[in-house]
Amino acid sequence: FDFSINFPAACISHDFKTFKWVAVTNTKLSKSYLHFLEGINLEFPDIHIVNLGEKNNKGASYSDTERKKLQNQLLLVNTLIDTVLTKVTQKPIIVGIEGFAYGAKGNSLVDIVQTTGILKKTISDRLLDKNLSGLFIFSPSELKNAIGAKGNANKFDVFNQFIEDPKIEAARDSALAKCLNKYKTELVTS
């Protein structure tokens, strides 16, 4: 799992030879970008992107705002896990998740930490049947180093590294690699 509030994603593999990807967009997107993502879903059946639309986090009071944020966080996490479960066909399940980076500040960091906690709890309950021995949490720099990128690499660097030198050879011919090669500019600039 690569978690973010606006675009969390997961890679699913049973054998490190075949891969499926799921993602949830959780922000307002232009009609043209929505159409673009729908096209990706059609062109690459092993990639499944769900759009939740624009978040509504503003309430009339502090309590109302926090309730709306929590509703949005629960919808985001449950939609992501529901989508993953449609692609998982074997047990036991092993889950790797990227730990959060501390680049965010203030309330956005609090929201990321809170939502990541909800995600971990949901993974425990719904994917791992509360058996946490199947959960592995990696620091962002560990994951970047594992693919051959620098620990402080940004998303563009990670995309480039994945396209140019995937560490799992089968990933070179995966739907995600083909999609990134074909639509890299559209994906990283939107």
Show where each model-derived region lies.
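Phosphate- and other anionic-substrate recognition elements at nucleic-acid/protein interfaces
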Residues: F1-S190
